[in-house]
Structure formats: structure tokens, C-alpha cells
Curated annotation (Swiss-Prot):
Sequence repeats lie at residues 67-88, 89-110, 111-121, 122-143, 144-165, 166-187, 188-207, 208-229, 230-240, 241-264. This is Apolipoprotein A-I. InterPro entries: ApoA_E, Apolipoprotein_A1/A4/E. It comes from the Eukaryota.
Length: 264
């Protein structure tokens, strides 16, 4: 499991665009980013799982059962790889279709957000400026107290804390006033953005393409079922003999252990 966590952490820390940066490839599409993440995760699961299977086979119980788990694990990995290859084109077609059909909504929302951002930016700048002024206003009051702490003994710490509490409470109260003032100024824009979002969602709901998209999604799921059915059946057929062998050997070991207990 550590390998899985490490792989996912590396992907998030480096970003799925790392390959584009180093190799100067074209920027990845959303589907490519999802596919890369899924591939890294699945590969990590397979690798870590194979490691655990190998450890079990080398154990005393694994040698006694002789299940050939590694061989079956590799077969499973090969079958799963074929399943990924079959799903790729169909899923990408569906993703591209979804992205294309909702592109207009994304553009409108980005336009709305940019418009609101330009209107509220002066208020945000004003808030930041006032907050910096408040911090500078309290700095001369706090710095002498810090010097006293460095120069004084431990017994002065409690006295220093008492002096800091009123200053901290005063700064907190003034910050709340600025936050409340900012919230009041931004409220109309928040309501405006919420109303616009409601309008966009209503337009999306009334769009004739929505019914068409629902039909596409249904057809996509149907295609996925048709594509994966043969491969899943092959996987099931391949695992059944191994599962039956596992069951038989486990029962054999259990019977042997029971007989030993009865003879004691």
C-alpha cells in the first residue's frame, strides 16, 4: 500500500503536466490527465499487490499450498491491460463529446467570473491595505514586549501574556470590523453571481442538447458493456480454475490439520 500512496503523492506533487514541461509535448486534455492518474494508480496497486503475493508464496503456508499465485497474478494483469485498451477509445469519445457540449457553459461562466472579479478587486485591495495598516499600527506596541521577554526572567512571562491579551483582542475586533465591511460590500456581487449561475443552469436544463446528451450517455454505457463483456468473461474463466484449486487445497490443509488434532 505504501507504493500506492507514494505513486499518488508523486502525481499530485509533480502534477500531470510534468510530462508536458520536460518533453515539450502538447498540453494534456482533461481525459488524458484522468487516464494518466488512473494508470499510475492501477500500476502501483498491481506492483504492490505482486510484492505481497510474492511474500506469501515464500512463506511456509504459501509453499505448503503451492497455489502459483504469481503466475495467476501476471495473467490477471495482462487481462486487465487488455480491458484498459478496449475501454480507452470509447471512453475518450464520450469525454470529448461531453467537453464539447458543455464548452459554451464553461465560457459563459468564465466570462461572468472575470466580470465579477474586476468589480470586487478594488474592495479586496482596500481590505488588504487596511489590514496591513492595522498590523503596522500594532507592531510598535508589540516589539517592546518581545524585547522584555528576551531580556527578562521566566517569571515575567505571565505578566507579558497579560499585556498581550488586550492588544490581541483589540486587533481581532478591528479585523472583524474590516471583514464585516468587506462582506457588506461584496454581498451584491455574490447575489449577482448566484443569479447568473441560476440562469446558466436553467438554460442548460432547457437546452435540447441535454436530452441528446442523456441518450449519448446511455449509448456510451451500452457500448462499454459490449466492449468489456468478452474480456470480463475471459477473466472469469481464467480465474475459476485457480479459485477451485485454492478451495480444494485449503480444504485439504484443513482436513490434515483436523486429523492431526484428533490423533493427539
Amino acid at each position: 500500500m505504501k507504493a500506492v500512496v507514494l505513486a499518488v503523492a508523486v502525481l499530485f506533487l509533480t502534477g500531470s503536466q510534468a510530462r508536458h514541461f520536460w518533453q515539450q509535448d502538447e498540453p494534456q486534455s482533461p481525459w488524458d490527465r484522468v487516464k494518466d492518474f488512473a494508470t499510475v494508480y492501477v500500476d502501483a496497486v498491481k506492483d504492490s499487490g505482486r510484492e505481497y503475493v510474492s511474500q506469501f508464496e515464500t512463506s511456509a503456508l504459501g509453499k505448503q499450498l503451492n497455489l502459483n499465485l504469481l503466475e495467476n497474478w501476471d495473467t490477471f494483469g495482462s487481462t486487465f491491460g487488455r480491458l484498459q485498451e478496449q475501454l480507452g477509445p470509447v471512453t475518450r469519445e464520450f469525454w470529448d463529446s461531453l467537453e464539447k457540449d458543455t464548452d459554451w457553459l464553461r465560457q459563459e461562466m468564465n466570462k461572468d467570473l472575470e466580470e465579477v472579479k474586476q468589480k470586487v478587486q478594488p474592495y479586496l485591495d482596500e481590505f488588504q491595505k487596511k489590514w496591513e495598516e492595522e498590523v503596522e499600527r500594532y507592531r510598535p506596541k508589540v516589539e517592546p514586549l518581545g524585547a522584555q521577554l528576551r531580556e527578562g526572567a521566566r517569571q515575567k512571562l505571565e505578566e507579558l501574556q497579560k499585556q498581550l491579551v488586550p492588544l490581541g483582542e483589540d486587533l481581532r475586533d478591528r479585523a472583524r470590523l474590516h471583514v464585516d465591511a468587506l462582506r457588506t460590500k461584496l454581498a451584491p456581487y455574490s447575489d449577482q453571481m448566484r443569479d447568473r449561475l441560476a440562469e446558466r443552469l436553467t438554460a442548460l436544463r432547457d437546452n435540447p442538447k441535454l436530452a441528446e446528451y442523456h441518450a449519448r450517455a446511455t449509448e456510451h454505457l451500452k457500448k462499454l458493456g459490449e466492449k468489456t463483456k468478452p474480456t470480463l468473461e475471459d477473466l472469469r474463466q481464467g480465474l475459476m480454475p485457480w479459485l477451485e484449486s485454492l478451495k480444494a487445497k485449503a480444504l485439504s490443509v484443513l482436513d490434515e490439520a483436523t486429523q492431526k488434532l484428533n490423533t493427539q
